[in-house]
Structure formats: structure tokens, C-alpha cells
């Protein structure tokens, strides 16, 4: 791991005794104290981590790690004597009860954290306390609830490259999801990583035994070219990624002899990636068992393809402007009541369906729920009471769940039974999935409720976990403790009467245990059987043999009680862990129902319709609306618009073209309209109702958007070059089943160049690819394309012209705009009147004398016949440009 520190990290604050050593490599190890030598040896084993070393009530760090966390966490850097010949070494620590909090902060800053725990009671240790690293926490291996975002996955990914081919595996160890795939093209791998947004990415390198972590934004020659550097990359040696070792590890984890049943028998790169990921979990989780679901193999062709640019432009999970959740499509349609439902909805949005039957199955559930307002409310109330089953099961299976987790799990499993009763008569496939809850889960819930108290403490080692009457031995211990504590409670009264000292008190502290306190003034009245234990300024403290005997009995009984309660709890947790896979299977069904109930709520309150889906190329939307923008406006303010693309040509007044040239002034709503069409199509392909009066939609294989561009400073590319790269990607990957949404192609260069590029791109999309396309532009010269290519039509965003202003009507209708109203927009923005006047003069001259304008006025306007899709080579050469 790099030791570099961000510029905004505060300067280290130091304690009174400055450290003489801040680097472990500068000290004589033989001169170190035994404890410090053990620390240094462990640090050598985990050089790329922050080693948190348990010492009593603190986790301490030393040397360079102490300096690092003092800066990163804004802690005071202290020091510790570490041998007479060595002197003081740098030290910084955190309280043991705040381990999760500080570990999360370190992980968020890109550090890996090794947890070294005490493996025995220091009070009973012979010599140096036994300590071991019990877990390594990295960005991709989080289990603790406080470290995770409840509504998004925390993926650990691993990839393997072989020429132009790659294998990818990813897992969320908190939910158990584990998937793998294999494909070609480096750019496709980059796009898949950008879709997943993994917290950590593993990849093998040829460097022997390398273990290095690249924090987000760090550059390295070891990182393969073309991959985004915004992730945390963990470089691993090739050993665990070899075919033989990876295959063997997967077979051992799942107890299989062949990978055929997992779907990856003939995907060697996918197997290597999955095996390497499992090896990393073994290395970081130590003895912690991670209950992963069976490895699932998927292909990219199963889902509608959305590249990173399209996801960003459509603002699916965050806004492109400032990256916030509010204002995204997910914000607008997420009405889920469970954390796992919200995570699943995010996955649905990022992987829309291609299978018509799957889409219609989701629609059927919404259609069934739509008229049942009261029933939906009951389901939502029930769902609201269900905790995060996926992650609760994961913590139980890994042995990290506490008693509160199991109580939450018991309550949630109990709600499943209620849910199954409510959906008993439902007919939709997704609702029927919850009609039967495995009896073993109901039995497990009853067992948990019977054993655990309703509000248990967080600690598992201080008792208070198990209900009375569960275990006779435990009840007997508790009764003995109560009896002895009652004797001590009566002791104060009895001793006051026996000694005549009215101020006598019985007290307790951890250092001395129980004691009898008498003021200094009356200490000489203490009976002979009192044994002086401690002298303070205002009091004397005594003990008696019988008091110490009772104390020992209480201590022994409590120790045995706490251990027995812990053992009983661990048994319960193990039983839950054994059912983790089954619990997660049911959780997936709950998540789907949660999503569909939420989508129904949105459909009802926003007035959505059920789109008619087909395998055709038709996109016909009546009164479509932008699902996010309309929620940001007062009711009735959003102007709906129709869209017709991709159906067979006809002689109707409103043609159904493959490509629409959309013209209109700035701020008239063109970009909003483009996004609106894309979002409606995407929502339909996740099985949702859509914001329209009606819709007939053919399934798309890809949605491409190019709406706005900015300089790519990281690669030194200008706005125009970024635009051209994105456009090239669209032209190289779009098909006749794709939906392409383009805004202002060619605006980043000279007018002639820009118009030429825009014309040729539009022409290629319409004539060669025949993709369903909306092409928004300020080049109103492109309106001429509709007269040359039959499957192109002109549409415009209407404005109302007044003598001194223009009013945007936001209505899209047939016909091309002849003006862009740029000068009017400049006037509205506050340009000086003299500048506006001069601009009008120049515009008039350009319109009268421009070669482009003159050429277009003289050009051929006879429409050409639509060519067959097979004639791809010479199509564009047959068009005679009208200038």
C-alpha cells in the first residue's frame, strides 16, 4: 500500500513524549521488548495493512502505522518505551469498543486493516499474551453493519486477462452473492466494472509474491491499460489464479467434482477469476467462514447493455451534475420498504431484461396489485418489519452476528409467515413465490424467540442473552448469584447493627471487589474480624473472610453463567448459519415482491400505464413524461410528448421513422425529451409501468446516449475528442434493435466540420444501422436529410414568438425548426443590447450569403427509397448532398 497522504490530511498532533523511532526498519529487533518484537514480526507478515494490535481495552499501532492513523484519523501520536536500548517508539491507538467506527474510516480512505486479537485472558496468561491476526478488513471484505451501505452492494471483484479475452468474478460477502462471467474486449471489462462499482478489485500480476494495494486514483504500470483507475485495486500473485488451483478451490468450497453444475466448466478465465477471489477471502478472513451462495455464471447477452456513459446520462442511480441520489431515477421510483429490496431494485435498473416472458411476469404482478390499495398497504406494513435477511444470514454464517442480529432475524422470519398468508390467493408468479415459507425457517424463528431475550445487550460475554427456564443449569447459576448478591445487600444493614456505625457502607469496584467502607473518624471502631484493605483520605476500606468468600462465589458463578450463555448463543447462531443459503433464497423472493409493490405505488400515484411489450422494433409512446422531472414540478406542470420510432413506414401524417431529427432552441427541453424516451424504454424492460398514457415498445438490446460532454483531463482529451470517442463507440456497437439518443453531435469543432460529421453520423445510423434514433441538433440544415432518406423524419420543440421574447412550449411535434433562437437565448441570459443587435446583423448576412445556406436552398429534395439492411457498404455514397 502506498504511504502517500492526501494534502488535506491534518498535520500529526504529538503527545508530551516524542517518539525516537517511527520506522520499524530502523530499530534493532533483538533489543525490542518481547511484545514489540511480536508486533514487528506480525507487521512483516501484513506489510500492506494497518495492524491493529489488541492491548487490554485498546487496539494499538506502532511505528509507521501509528503515524499513518494519527494523520488519517486525527489522533494524537504518543509513544511507548520499547526496550532500554531502543527507547520510545511511535504509538497511536483506538478504544476496542470503537473498532468498527475507526476501521470503517480507514477502509474508506483506502487502507486495509489487520485485526490482531488477544487469544487468551491476560490475567491468566503465562508470559506474553497470545495474540493472532483474526481477520483482515479490506474495502471489498466488509461484514459489519456499521461499515456497509444498507441500500447498495459492497462488491469484491477479481479479473483475469488473456489476450483480448477476460474472466470476471464478483461477490458481496455480506449478502452471499457470487457470480462469474467470461467475455472479450478490454473495453467491455471496463464497462462491467463501472456497472458493478466494486469497492475492491483483485488482479494477478507476474511480479513474484507481490501484494500491493492501489488506492483510488493511484497510477501504476502494473494496472492493465484501459481500466478505470477510480477503484481500489489489490495486486495479487499469479499463484492463486492458476487454472488448476482455482478449479480445485471452487470444487472444495462447493463440494463438487465438476464445475458443470455451476455453469463454468468451459469458461477457464471465469474459473480462474472466481478461484482467485476465493483464495483472497481465505487469506483475509482467516478462520471466519464466509457463507457464499452457489457460484452463478451469467452472460452479458442476458441483459440490455448500458455503457457507463449511458448510465451517467440517464442518471439512473445518481445525478450527472453533482452525483447525488436525489434527482436520479432510483430516487424517483424506489418505494421499497427493505434494504435488500432497495439493493435489488438498483440491480434491476442496471441490468434491464431482454426476455419478454420475464418482463411480462413482473408486469403481471403490478397489474394484480394495482387495484388492491388496501392489500398493498398491508404488504408494505409487513415488509417494513423485515430486517436485512441477506446480511443477517451472512453474519450468522460467518460467526459475527450478535444477539440483536438473531432477534431481528427471528422477527423477520416471523413476518414471512404472515406474508405467505397474505399472498396465498395471488396469481402472479412473483407473488406466488412467497406463498410457501420453508417450515424449517418458521421453526428456527420460534426457537430463537423462545431462547433469546427481547432486548439483548450487544456484548456476548457479559450475560443477559438467554431467557429464564431455557436451561436448568443456567437457572441454577442465576439463582445462586441472586442469593449471594442478596446476602451482600443485607450485609450493610446487619453490620451497621452489629458495629453501631451508622455511616458504614458496603461498596464495590473492579480493582478491589466488594469492601466495607468506614469513615476515618470511626475507623477505630471496626471489629477485630475486619481486615484493612485500603486507606483513603476520608475513609478506610475493609474486607471480611466471609465477604471475600461470597465475592468469589459470585465471580465464579457469573463467569460460568456468562460462558454458558455464550455457548448457548453460539449454538443458536450456528443453527441459523446452517440455513443461511435458504434464508437468502427466501430473501430474494421478498426483495422482488418489495420492488413490485413499490413500483405499483409509483404507478398508481404518478399515473403510469402498462406498456405493451413485443420483440418488434416499435417504440410508440403517447403522452410520455420524464419520471424524475415530473416529480420535481407541481402536478400538471410537466408537458407530455409522444414518440414514434421503428415501425414500418407508412403514408400517415405522423410517420414512424427509425431516426428523428429533433430541432429547437436551447433550454426548450430537447435533452429532457431524449432522456425521457430512454428512461421509459428502460423502465419497461425492468417490468415496470411507465409514465405515459399508453406505450407499445419493442425490446431494445442496447440503449446509447450521448448527451453533453466535458473534457477528460485524466487522458488529456478535449470535449470534442470525448464526444467523438463516444459517438464512435455507438456506431461500432449499435444494431437495428438498439435505441440511440444523441444530443448536439459535432458542436465542439468548426461549423463546417461539425455539420459534416453530424450529417454523416445521422445518415449512417438511419441508412446503415437502422437503429431507432433521436438526433437532437442545432444544425437545422440536417432537416434536409429527411428528404433524402425515407426512414428519417423531422420533429421540433415548439416555441411561441412574441415581439420582445420567446416562450418555450416544450411540445414536440412534426416538422423541422428553421431557427435555433440562440440570439434570443443570449438576450435572456443578459448579453448587452449592443451585442444582441450586432449578432442579428451578422446572422442576417450569414443566412443570405453562407455557402451552406445557399447550397441547401438549391439542393435536391427528392426522397430516396429505403435500402435493405444488407446494403451496408455503399449506402452513404449514394446520397448526393445538397451542398
From Swiss-Prot:
It holds the Pfam family MutS_V. CDD domains: ABC_MutS1. GO terms for cellular component: cytosol. GO terms for biological process: mismatch repair. It comes from the Bacteria. Residues 11-25 have a biased composition (Basic and acidic residues). Residues 1-25, 857-883 are annotated as: Disordered. Keywords: ATP-binding, DNA damage, DNA repair, DNA-binding, Nucleotide-binding. Disulfide bonds: none annotated. Belongs to the DNA mismatch repair MutS family. NCBIfam families: mutS1, PRK05399.1. PANTHER family: DNA MISMATCH REPAIR PROTEIN MSH1, MITOCHONDRIAL (PTHR11361:SF34), DNA MISMATCH REPAIR PROTEIN MUTS FAMILY MEMBER (PTHR11361). This protein is involved in the repair of mismatches in DNA. It is possible that it carries out the mismatch recognition step. This protein has a weak ATPase activity. This is DNA mismatch repair protein MutS.
